[in-house]
Amino acid sequence: DVRMIDEKEVKEICPYLSDEVIGASWCPTDGHANPLTTTLGYYKRALEMGVRFYTDAPVKALQKVKGKVRKVILNDGTVFEGETVILVAGYESREIARTIGIDIPMTRLIDECLVTEMQPHMIDVMFGCATADFYGHQTHHGSFVFGSDSGWEVVDEMVDPSTNTADPSKLITNSMTLSASCRAIQSYIPALRDAKIVRSWCGWLDEAFDGV
């Protein structure tokens, strides 16, 4: 369903985008979901289906039985065993997978998010910048939600002088990161120039070395 569109069609779909946008990839079947309500929905439905959840239960290792991953060992020594084990621990999956001899090259990316005050209806689609400066959408009640990587999260302390390479785990936000992200957003959506930010936060994203 994905196709490339020119500036004219971009403006037909999103008239509030600035002239900075001269083309885009467009997928009419794309969408977005509120992560809080979606996660809660999955959780409630899983409970109805008999799923049990264990919180505050850090995983120490996986273990194979007859060549197949069957056991999950917790830090306190508790062992769970099943026919199928699914590893979905984000960046921490790498350390857990290493316990069975598998290494998945991964790194952590810092992502800063912000929510604006309620705005007039402007945009119906999920959108983002190809250079990954920001991505976002307008909610049903009018606020905009954006995620961004401004490039200003780098600090001198994250560079190991012996190798001259950066340690992504030492990325931090600072007084420049949010304002830099806002400037990028304003350049593409000028109508948000005077919008107030209701709240912002940041967290880690996991990324494999192949960019997935």
Which positions does each model-derived feature cover?
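A short alpha-helix-loop-beta-strand transition element characteristic
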Residues: 1-7, 104-106, 194
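Active-site-adjacent segment of FAD-dependent monooxygenases/related oxidoreductases
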Residues: 1-9, 13, 22-36
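Short loop/edge segments at beta-strand edges and connector loops
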Residues: 6, 55-57, 199
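Short, solvent-exposed loop/turn elements at beta->coil junctions and helix N-caps
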Residues: 11, 59-61, 200-205
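A short, glycine/Asx- and small/polar-enriched loop/turn
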Residues: 14-22, 63-70, 207-211
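Helical element adjacent to the flavin cofactor pocket in flavoenzyme catalytic cores
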Residues: 25-84
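Central helical "cap/lid" subdomain
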Residues: 76-124
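Active-site lid/adjacent beta-loop-alpha segment flanking the redox-cofactor pocket in flavoenzymes
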Residues: 120-212
